[in-house]
Amino acid sequence: TQMTPAAVACDQKCVYCWRVNEMFSGNQDLMEYAKDDPADIVQGSIEGHLRKISGFGGNPNVDQQKVLESKTVRHFAISLTGEPTLYKRLPEMLRELRSRKISSFLVTNGLHPEMIEKLRDEDSLPTQLYMSLDAPDKRTWKKIDVPLVPNFWDKIKGTLALMDGLE
C-alpha cells in the first residue's frame, strides 16, 4: 500500500510537484498536530487498502487468486505526499511494520539527516531507503525544489553522507 504520515507538511515547494503545497510554510507547524499512533496509522492504511480493492472480487474478468493475494499487505511505500521524515514517530511506525512482517520503502527529500540518524540508531531503518536527488548542485536545487529551509544544501549533503554508511 502507498501512504504517508505527513500529508500536510513538506519543507520544499518543488516546481514539478502535483500535490497541493500552498499550506507548506517551512515551519512545519502543522506537523505539531500529527500525534496519531503509528499502529493506528498502519492499521488504517491496511484497512484503506482493503476497501480500495474490495470491488475486484466480484469482477469475473479478474484473477481471483490475485484478488486473494492482494488482501495480504506485504509492502508499504511511504512516499505519497509531504515529507515523511517530518513525522516524529516514524521510527515507531517502521518498527510496527517490521513486527507485522511488512516491508517498507521510504522516500525522503533529504532535508532531515537527524531523522535518518534516529532511524539508524533506533534500529528502525526501512527495508529500502530512497532520497530524491532532483538537481546536481545547490543553485539548481534551489531553483527546482524551492527549499523552505535556509541550510538545505548542508542537510542534503549530511543525508547523503549518512546514507553512504548505512547497511
Model-inferred region functions:
Residues 22-36, 42, 96-100, 105, ...:
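Long, hydrophobic, well-ordered secondary-structure blocks that form the structural core
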Residues 1-20, 77-79:
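N-terminal pre-triad scaffold of radical SAM enzymes
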Residues 13-15, 26-27, 116, 142:
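Intrinsically disordered, low-complexity regions enriched in proline, serine, glycine
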Residues 1-7, 21-41, 47-65, 69-70:
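N-terminal [4Fe-4S]-dependent radical SAM core
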Residues 8, 20-22, 134-138:
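Short connector loops/turns at beta-strand edges and beta->alpha or beta->beta junctions
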Residues 57-167:
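Conserved AdoMet/S-adenosylmethionine-binding subsite of the radical SAM
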Residues 17, 21-24, 148:
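Cys/His-rich zinc-coordinating "finger/knuckle" motifs
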Residues 15-18, 46, 91, 95-98:
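Amphipathic alpha-helical interaction motifs in eukaryotic regulatory proteins
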